[in-house]
Amino acid sequence: MAFLKKSLFLVLFLGLVSLSICEKEKKEQEDEDENEEEKESEEGSEEKRGLLDTLGGILGLGR
């Protein structure tokens, strides 16, 4: 009976450890995805600013 308890404890412990590792990797992946989205939105806003500067120069609305 003691052997069965130890085996069950070992299986549960290893399952929790692997679950913890998977959750950690998932969080890291989500953080990387968020960082990529922020970079893409920054690039888009830079393109818009460049376009507005160009249009302002053409229309004589310069600084």
UniProtKB/Swiss-Prot annotation:
Compositional bias per record (Acidic residues), positions renumbered to this chain: 30-45
Entry GO CC: extracellular region
Residue segments, region Disordered: 25-63
Primary location: secreted
Tissue: Expressed by the skin glands.
Signal peptide: 1-22
Alphabetical UniProt keywords: Amidation, Amphibian defense peptide, Antibiotic, Antimicrobial, Immunity, Innate immunity, Secreted, Signal
Listed transmembrane segments: none
Pfam families: FSAP_sig_propep
Subcellular location per the Swiss-Prot or TrEMBL entry: Secreted
Residues found modified as Leucine amide: L61
Residue ranges the record assigns to the propeptide: 23-49
GO biological process terms, semicolon-separated: defense response to bacterium; innate immune response
Keyword ATP-binding in annotation: no
Protein family membership: Belongs to the frog skin active peptide (FSAP) family. Frenatin subfamily.
Role description: Antimicrobial peptide with selective activity. Is only active against Micrococcus luteus (MIC=25 ug/ml) and not against Bacillus cereus, Escherichia coli, Leuconostoc mesenteroides, Micrococcus luteus, Pastewella haemolytica, Staphylococcus aureus, Streptococcus faecalis and Streptococcus uberis.
Protein name as catalogued: Frenatin 1.1
Organism in which the protein naturally occurs: Nyctimystes infrafrenatus (White-lipped tree frog)
